Curated annotation (Swiss-Prot):
Highest taxon above the source species: Eukaryota
Name of the molecule in the record: Nuclear pore glycoprotein p62
Residues in coiled coil: 211-341
Low complexity biased stretches: 45-57
Loss of function: phenotype: RNAi-mediated knockdown in oocytes results in increased nuclear size. RNAi-mediated knockdown in oocytes and nurse cells results in irregular distribution of chromatin to the nuclear periphery disrupting karyosome morphology. Simultaneous RNAi-mediated knockdown of nucleoporin Nup154 restores normal karyosome formation.
Sequence repeats: 22-23, 50-51, 75-76, 77-78, 116-117
Keyword Transmembrane helix appears in the UniProt entry: no
GO cellular component: centrosome; chromatin; cytoplasm; nuclear envelope; nuclear pore central transport channel; spindle pole
InterPro entries for this protein: NSP1/NUP62, Nucleoporin_NSP1_C
Gene: Nup62
């Protein structure tokens, strides 16, 4: 297990890089670009480690070759130089982007095997380059288990190519679908090694890019859709506004009706109270008429005759009033009938003269009546004075 800096980028020229690590580091070859036929060589990296160094240099021993078993080396402390590795990191590590080169004949050199077969030892992977055209590479970052940091071996990067791409092949002791831990004894102690099969990188096709014309068509299409949606929204907003105005007007009408209903209820309560008061008065009047009716039965016969006479007088008075009304109607009808007659008719003139004489006579009669009354009053006064004069000597 290696603890190193978060980002390790393979140099395009295959130069050596240095990192600080605790544990076992395995080598990963780095492809160096070349203009013609070239042989890819692994890039070396000097590491400072507390563990078993690589077999190339350092103090201590280990499994220098997979084909032969050696005695287990002692635990060493020193500087060891190894090939470029893809260590197990704690953090997000950017993957190197090696560029493929066009070569007629190219041979690959495999990296050195791991220096010490520990719990986290991984077999080295060798890259066999083939004839390919160079293309931009896409780097895949590792997503780890602890909050987005990578806790494990970094994934290999896939080189995008239009024709042929270089596919790295994993060299492992066991080629299987799933990694299987193996227990191997060598020397004085047993080493528990876990061999994993690296995932083959597949060619990733470049994403199709939109041209300016296609982008303009999409923008125009979206603009038309947006305008249609805007029209629909405007229509719906106008309709909702009309509904809102209608609701407001209906709300005002409902409030007015509510006020009118409250007023009617108040008037109804007042009317009920007045009706109750009238009913109470009527009941009191009935209670008062009860004793009077009892007393009326005990009245003598004279009172009964007087009451009958009073009823007859009332009847006569009603008849006289009816007769006077009839006379007025007859006079009005005669006047209406006389309006249409000719005023030059001598009969009409004679009638007018007679009416004037009649009115004069009536006035004379009323005046004579008044004079006679005054004379009578004067005579009465004179008589009284005479009596007073004759009574004086006595």
């Amino acid at each position: 297990m290696v603890f190193q800096l978060p980002t390790t980028t393979a140099a395009p020229t295959g130069g050596a890089t240095s990192s600080f690590s605790f544990g076992l580091s395995t080598g990963t070859p780095a492809a160096a670009p070349a203009s013609g036929a070239a042989t890819t060589a692994p890039a070396t990296k000097t590491t400072f480690s507390f563990g078993t160094p690589a077999p190339t240099a350092g103090i201590g021993g280990g499994d220098a070759d997979n084909s032969k078993a050696q005695a287990p080396p002692a635990f060493g402390f020193g500087l060891g130089s190894g090939t470029a590795s893809a260590p197990l990191t704690l953090g997000t590590q950017a993957a190197a982007n090696p560029a493929s080169t066009t070569s007629a004949t190219a041979t690959g050199t495999s990296a050195a095997p791991p220096a010490f077969g520990g719990f986290t030892a991984q077999p080295a992977a060798s890259v066999v380059p083939t004839i390919a055209t160079s293309a931009p590479n896409t780097a895949a970052t590792t997503t780890g288990l602890l909050g987005g940091s990578g806790l494990g071996a970094p994934k290999t990067t896939a080189a995008a190519s239009t024709t042929l791409t270089a596919a790295p092949s994993a060299i492992a002791s066991t080629q299987g679908a799933a990694p299987a831990p193996t227990l191997s004894t060598g020397g004085a102690f047993a080493n528990l090694t876990t061999e994993t099969k690296t995932t083959d990188s597949s060619a990733v096709s470049t994403a199709s890019q939109l041209s300016y014309h296609q982008l303009e068509e999409h923008i125009n299409k979206w603009t038309l859709e947006f305008e249609e949606q805007e029209k629909v929204f405007t229509e719906q907003a106008t309709q909702i506004n009309a509904w809102d105005k209608l609701l407001i007007s209906n709300n005002g009408k409902i409030v007015e009706l509510n006020d009118a209903v409250k007023k009617v209820k108040t008037d109804q309560q007042v009317l009920d109270q007045e009706l109750e008061f009238i009913a109470t008065q009527q009941k009191e009047l009935e209670d008062s008429l009860g004793p009077l009716e009892k007393e009326f039965v005990n009245l003598p016969r004279v009172d009964m005759e007087r009451s009958q006479t009073y009823l007859m007088v009332e009847n006569l008075d009603t008849q006289l009033k009816q007769m006077s009304e009839d006379l007025k109607e007859i006079i009005d009808n005669l006047n209406e009938a006389n309006k249409g007659q000719d005023t030059t008719d001598p009969i009409i003139q004679i009638g007018k003269i007679l009416n004037a004489h009649m009115n004069s006579l009536q006035w004379i009669e009323s005046q004579s009546t008044n004079i006679s009354k005054k004379l009578e009053d004067i005579g009465k006064i004179q008589d009284s004075q005479k009596r007073d004069i004759f009574r004086a000597p006595f």
